[in-house]
């Protein structure tokens, strides 16, 4: 086809050049590419100009391949002299590599020899000869070469015909191309070299199926640069007319663009060498050369190959450029199928406007690609419009074509073939645009192109657990992300956008930044890869880039442009192993935040369920909660947070008797903690945090959780959370409290109620053990209520507010309220709750610190002692908090986040130093065991916590804060420290507590890094009283507790 197209496009100069080339090629037919001596035209055919020496046996294979490539064979085999540039095509990578092996000067010498011989032979040989040898190796010949280069493997057609040989030359494309190019221009030697090297070596010789597809670009740069090609071209008769044809070339570019489609489309008789070189046939000679090789495109009869110097030269300059462009297009398509059309178009179309710039090649490629694709669209199965995109990517990306890339390119081309034909009928720039679209947003990128829209469909395919249900939920929003994520920049970001949860599936900080659509967690703690697999693969792929690393993307493709289709196909066709859901994982790095979140939640839930099965006490309070607690974005997916309701069922199921469990949503507990609805909101997180109780261990991508929940791994925390998950509700609260260190303040109150309920239930569970404790706690609660009631406790402080609120509740409830508070304490059984009580005590130092406080502390301490053997309140706190760290930290808060937080804040510093990770871990175990028998009685837990606090309290409020904060705060660290929790929510202890909240807990949990400062801050803000007062209360409690201990 191209042969015919070429005759149309080819100018007389080109035909002459082609003849000379053919003559030269005949002369150097023996070693076309390296062949210093032209081979007989058949020999050339066999050896292929460039490809022959490198390919050696390529000619025969080419003969075998031509059938498919014949259509594009026109330009596949030879080194096309397009716009005076020799574009070498290689039938095989081997030929290309051989040629590449030649050093530039060697290659140049070869080319020069060829050029010398070519001019002689070209002049000597009639166009037919050249057509037979290389089809007149004119512009068309290079096109053929290019095409053969692209088709190298395919275009073995018509070895007998020289033209075919150009096609056949595919393997020895370089030969024909180089001959043509070198003949056409001495510049072409370097260019040919470059072209052969880039195009053949990396160029689009094999572009279609070889791997070097995208190489056109490589050659293109050099090809485009040389106007010198014309020198050799001038050497040829047509070379002299070269300058004129540049305009002609432009005209022809368009002309041939049109012609290309037709002529290229019509296969020309392979044997039909350019008969006479009629002047009108300058394009025809182009095609004509190809005609000998049957073209897929146009059965244009090979027109006489006029030696249109114009076309020849334009092609030399532009043509070579276009040749590369063409090669790129062909190579990109790796189809070489449209090689003939691209050759004609490439030569001429490329000639005109883009002759000068290598990038023009891309444009030319687009033009030529269009023609080429239109001609070979069927061949590539890409719509005619589609061709331009491949062409563009080919030219732009073709450059890098590496052998390794060839495989990828081939795959990509295949993918493209599929996708192009189906997907992008009319986007010549589609690839770039698509690529961008693919890159575009999705994961701020996620995967270069894995982002294309199909990416989200994979949503959570890779995600382990229950992702299937949720993944689809967010894909639409993330669609935009997925594509962008595809971009190298972004792909990795999600590289995926929301790498957060799925990657951290196990401990991903569901609690921290719920990905929601855009969980902050994603960026903050987690690699932005929602899907670790995709993110990693895509990142590696993406970062390697379409340019090189991208396994799926042809190296030669521009990163963002034109890769889209390529990438899309690549990803789809070549889904990287890591992206088994690759096509899913078109946005590998970025799953939709929601999908990730849901997947994570599902996974977590499953894990929790498993743990619950293993350890009923774990009672995955957050099992469902996690699902919902995990919903990352507070406001993003309020509904997701409602699943906390599911969590509630979990809670109820977990702590069947723990109203707080259900309360999660409706009750005054985490769900209530924050508005039940709000829980879904930012505070949905708290609910989430309920899930985060277990997430707290996962907070920060499981960072905080594991570290924070020394007692339990991510799941251990859940376990501890459920176990000492005081009541499940407490666990929910734990999650809430520690999960949303900033959120806990509000929920704590509802939690108080819920906690009380739960604590009542739990107390019933524990009442035998805790009867005394309850009584004592009642006293404590009364004292606390009084303290709370006392105005001393600043209402401004969230804790104060909590206490006041609790007071109101207690006051309203009277003894029952006290009992509720008592249960709360029991529930909290954590310094947090006691601290809350202490806060009221602080508020009313006399009353609080009075015997009642002591009694409370002491009694609770006794309970703690009984309940929690571990000495050092920190252990109980760690028990709750250590477990709470995973999730129990919240339980301490669960009863009353503020009180718990307060205590933890104060105790956190002391506790941090005192408890240490080991201490926290140990007590959680024991409290967990103790609790198990007690059914996680909130009171028992509270007692344990208080016991834990007792030692901490002796250190004073700071000790208590340290103790509790390390366990509560540190445990809550996943989210925030209790202080941070309260500060954020209550702003009670601002920076110190807040700072303590998130970062300090890590340290605090490990040691007493922040105890000194935060405790004071907490003490003052929490108590709303002076640190001394707060400490007074806690110390008063602490000493008795210590005594009890």
Swiss-Prot record:
Which keywords fit this entry according to its UniProt record? Answer: Isopeptide bond, Phosphoprotein, Ubl conjugation
Where are the Phosphothreonine residues found in this chain? 989, 1010
In its UniProt entry, the species of origin is given as Homo sapiens (Human)
Q: From which residue to which does any coiled coil extend? A: none
Q: Which parts of the sequence are annotated with region: Disordered?
A: 1-86, 99-315, 443-462, 719-753, 809-880, 910-961, 991-1045
- At which residues is the cross-link Glycyl lysine isopeptide (Lys-Gly) (interchain with G-Cter in SUMO2) found? 858
Q: Where is the composition biased (Low complexity)?
A: 48-63, 910-922
Question: From the UniProt record, which GO molecular function terms apply?
Answer: RNA binding
Bias (Basic and acidic residues) occurs at 13-28, 99-123, 817-837, 923-949, 1029-1045
Give the matching PANTHER family: FIBROSIN FAMILY MEMBER, FIBROSIN-1-LIKE PROTEIN
Question: What is the recorded name of this protein?
Answer: Fibrosin-1-like protein
Q: Which InterPro entries match?
A: AUTS2
Q: What is a single Pfam family found in this protein's UniProt entry? A: Auts2
- Composition bias of kind Polar residues appears in 183-197
Regions of biased composition (Pro residues) lie at 270-280, 741-750, 998-1015
Regions of biased composition (Basic residues) lie at: 1-12, 443-457
Homology family = Belongs to the AUTS2 family.
Give the source's domain of life in one word.
Eukaryota
Q: Which residues carry this modification: Phosphoserine?
A: 340, 790, 937, 977
């Amino acid at each position: 086809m191209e042969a015919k197209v070429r005759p149309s496009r080819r100018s007389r100069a080109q035909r002459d050049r082609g003849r000379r080339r053919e003559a030269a090629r005949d002369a150097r037919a023996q070693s076309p590419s390296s062949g210093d001596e032209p081979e007989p035209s058949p020999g050339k055919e066999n050896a292929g100009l460039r490809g022959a020496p490198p390919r050696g046996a390529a000619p025969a294979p080419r003969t075998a391949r031509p059938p498919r490539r014949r259509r594009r064979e026109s330009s596949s085999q030879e080194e096309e002299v397009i716009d005076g540039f020799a574009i070498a095509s290689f039938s095989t990578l081997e030929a290309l590599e051989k040629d590449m092996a030649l050093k530039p000067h060697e290659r140049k010498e070869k080319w020069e020899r060829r050029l010398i011989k070519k001019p002689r032979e070209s002049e000597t040989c009639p166009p037919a000869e050249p057509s037979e040898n290389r089809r007149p190796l004119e512009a068309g010949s290079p096109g053929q070469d290019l095409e053969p280069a692209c088709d190298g493997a395919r275009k073995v057609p018509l070895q007998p015909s020289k033209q075919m040989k150009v096609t056949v030359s595919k393997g020895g494309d370089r030969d024909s191309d180089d001959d043509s190019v070198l003949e056409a221009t001495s510049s072409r030697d370097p260019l040919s070299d470059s072209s052969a090297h880039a195009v053949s070596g990396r160029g689009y010789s094999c572009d279609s199926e070889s791997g070097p597809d995208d190489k056109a670009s490589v050659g293109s740069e050099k090809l485009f640069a040389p106007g010198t090609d014309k020198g050799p071209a001038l050497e040829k008769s047509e070379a002299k007319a070269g300058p004129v044809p540049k305009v002609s070339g432009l005209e022809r570019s368009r002309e041939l663009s049109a012609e290309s489609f037709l002529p290229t489309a019509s296969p020309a008789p392979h044997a039909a060498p350019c008969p006479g070189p009629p002047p009108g046939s300058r394009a025809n000679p182009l095609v004509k050369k190809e005609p000998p090789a049957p073209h897929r495109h146009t059965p244009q009869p090979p027109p006489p190959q006029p030696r249109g110097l114009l076309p020849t030269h334009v092609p030399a300059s532009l043509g070579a450029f276009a040749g590369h462009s063409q090669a790129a297009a062909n190579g990109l398509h790796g189809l070489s199928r449209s090689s003939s059309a691209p050759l004609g178009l490439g030569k001429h179309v490329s000639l005109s406007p883009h002759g000068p710039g290598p990038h023009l090649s891309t444009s030319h490629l687009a033009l030529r690609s269009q023609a080429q694709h239109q001609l070979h669209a069927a061949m590539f199965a890409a719509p005619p419009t589609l061709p331009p995109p491949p062409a563009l990517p080919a030219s732009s990306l073709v450059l890098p074509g590496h052998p390794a890339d060839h495989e990828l390119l081939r795959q990509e081309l295949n993918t493209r073939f599929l996708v192009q034909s189906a997907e992008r009928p009319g986007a010549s720039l589609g690839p770039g645009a698509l690529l961008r679209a693919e890159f575009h947003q999705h994961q701020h990128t996620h995967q270069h192109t894995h982002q294309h829209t199909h990416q989200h469909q994979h949503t959570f395919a890779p995600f382990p657990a229950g992702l299937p249900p949720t993944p689809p939920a967010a894909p639409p929003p993330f669609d935009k992300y997925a594509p962008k994520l595809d971009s190298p920049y972004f792909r990795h970001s999600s590289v995926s956008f929301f790498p957060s949860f799925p990657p951290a599936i196990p401990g991903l900080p569901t609690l921290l930044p719920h990905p929601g659509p855009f969980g902050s967690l994603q960026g903050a703690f987690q690699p932005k890869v929602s899907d670790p697999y995709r993110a990693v693969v895509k990142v590696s792929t993406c970062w390697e880039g379409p340019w090189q690393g991208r396994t799926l993307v042809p190296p030669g493709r521009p990163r963002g442009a034109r890769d889209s289709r390529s990438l899309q196909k690549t990803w789809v066709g070549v889904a990287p192993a890591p992206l088994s859901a690759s096509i899913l994982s078109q946005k590998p790095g970025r799953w939709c935040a929601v999908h990730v979140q849901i997947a994570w939640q599902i996974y977590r839930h499953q894990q929790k369920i498993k743990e619950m099965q293993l350890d009923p006490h774990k009672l995955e309070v957050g099992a469902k909660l996690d699902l919902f607690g995990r919903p990352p974005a507070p406001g993003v997916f309020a509904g997701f947070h409602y699943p906390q309701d599911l969590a509630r069922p979990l809670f109820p199921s977990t702590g069947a008797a723990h109203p707080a469990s259900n309360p999660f949503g409706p009750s005054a507990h985490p769900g209530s903690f924050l508005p039940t609805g709000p829980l879904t909101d930012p505070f949905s997180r708290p609910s989430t945090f309920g899930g985060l109780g277990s997430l707290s261990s996962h907070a920060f991508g499981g960072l905080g959780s594991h570290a924070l929940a020394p007692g339990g791994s991510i799941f251990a925390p859940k376990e501890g959370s459920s176990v000492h998950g005081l009541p499940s509700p407490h666990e929910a609260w734990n999650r809430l409290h520690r999960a949303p260190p900033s959120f806990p303040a509000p929920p704590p109150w509802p939690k108080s109620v819920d906690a009380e309920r739960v604590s009542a239930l739990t107390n019933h569970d524990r009442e035998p053990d805790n009867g005394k404790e309850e009584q004592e706690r009642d006293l404590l609660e009364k004292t606390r209520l009084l303290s709370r009631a006392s105005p001393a406790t600043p209402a401004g402080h969230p804790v104060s507010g909590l206490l006041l609120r609790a007071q109101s509740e207690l006051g309203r409830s009277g003894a029952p309220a006290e009992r509720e508070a008592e249960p709360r304490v029991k529930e909290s059984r954590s310094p947090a709750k006691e601290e809350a009580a202490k806060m009221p005590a602080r508020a009313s130092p006399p009353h609080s610190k009075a015997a009642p406080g002591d009694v409370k502390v002491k009694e609770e301490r006794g309970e703690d002692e009984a309940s929690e053997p571990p000495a050092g309140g920190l252990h109980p706190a760690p028990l709750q908090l250590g477990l709470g760290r995973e999730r129990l930290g919240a339980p301490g808060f669960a009863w009353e986040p503020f009180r718990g937080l307060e205590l933890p804040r104060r105790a956190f510093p002391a506790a941090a130093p005192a408890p240490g990770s080991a201490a926290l871990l140990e007590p959680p175990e024991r409290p967990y065991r103790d609790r198990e028998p007690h059914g996680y009685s909130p009171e028992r837990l509270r007692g344990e916590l208080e016991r834990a606090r007792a030692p901490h309290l002796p250190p004073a409020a700071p000790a208590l804060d340290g103790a509790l904060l390390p366990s509560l705060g540190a445990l809550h660290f996943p989210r925030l420290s209790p202080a941070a929790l309260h500060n954020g929510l209550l702003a009670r202890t601002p920076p110190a507590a807040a700072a303590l909240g998130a970062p300090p807990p890590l340290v605090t949990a490990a040691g007493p890094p922040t105890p000194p400062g935060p405790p004071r801050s907490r003490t003052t803000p929490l108590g709303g009283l002076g640190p001394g007062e707060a400490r007074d209360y806690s110390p008063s409690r602490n000493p008795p507790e210590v005594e009890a201990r």
